[in-house]
């Protein structure tokens, strides 16, 4: 068993690649992350751990811009994320230089997933211990897109999805509450999904919003607090209405 446990390129007798499964476990223990695709907006949200008093919180960003029209959030090992993000940015720049056109969201997703897959079958390396949520706008159709990749190199397109810690709870919430929305409602859905698993409300949440016209913008803490207050007020009003509703006889 130990041989299959250590070797990245050797399958166990029951068909498992243990190092890939360990990388998936690193994702499950990482920060919560969520992505939501609206009709004219895409939103990324991540759980933000509290930083020491003397640390600059700007150095701990978990949402990165790959190009003017594409952004990425990840769950898992931050050092691995830095390597993958740098490789993806270089690919975006190289594509602009050689093709003279920006990459599509699907193209860069395939590139990232292909890179992750190569690290599951090469000697002297290990799988990337992170899962990514990639959002953006297609430069040709101007339509929003959301993709997810995982350490095995699998990728898929989504309307809304979550990864990282307690991702199943967030995904269940999104399945119950997702609707094709625009602007503010899309942002609120992403925040509501994170609040299902993140404690201390808005101060432990990082949100980035992208539109085709304005590109990527990270929300300030005050803006997130306003959304959280609005969500809590709506929840309180719904509970009050439920209690005040007449019981059926």
Swiss-Prot record:
Keywords, ordered alphabetically: Cytoplasm, Nucleus, Proteasome
Keyword Ribosomal protein: no
GO CC terms of this entry: cytoplasm; nucleus; proteasome core complex, alpha-subunit complex
SUPFAM superfamilies: N-terminal nucleophile aminohydrolases (Ntn hydrolases) (SSF56235)
Primary localization: cytoplasm
Subcellular location(s) of the protein: Cytoplasm; Nucleus
GO biological process, one term: ubiquitin-dependent protein catabolic process
Annotated Pfam families: Proteasome, Proteasome_A_N
NCBIfam families named among the record's database cross-references: PRK03996.1
Subunit-level organization: The 26S proteasome consists of a 20S proteasome core and two 19S regulatory subunits. The 20S proteasome core is composed of 28 subunits that are arranged in four stacked rings, resulting in a barrel-shaped structure. The two end rings are each formed by seven alpha subunits, and the two central rings are each formed by seven beta subunits. The catalytic chamber with the active sites is on the inside of the barrel.
UniProt function note: The proteasome is a multicatalytic proteinase complex which is characterized by its ability to cleave peptides with Arg, Phe, Tyr, Leu, and Glu adjacent to the leaving group at neutral or slightly basic pH. The proteasome has an ATP-dependent proteolytic activity.
Family: Belongs to the peptidase T1A family.
Protein name: Proteasome subunit alpha type-7-A
Organism: Oryza sativa subsp. indica
Origin organism lineage: Eukaryota, Viridiplantae, Streptophyta, Embryophyta, Tracheophyta
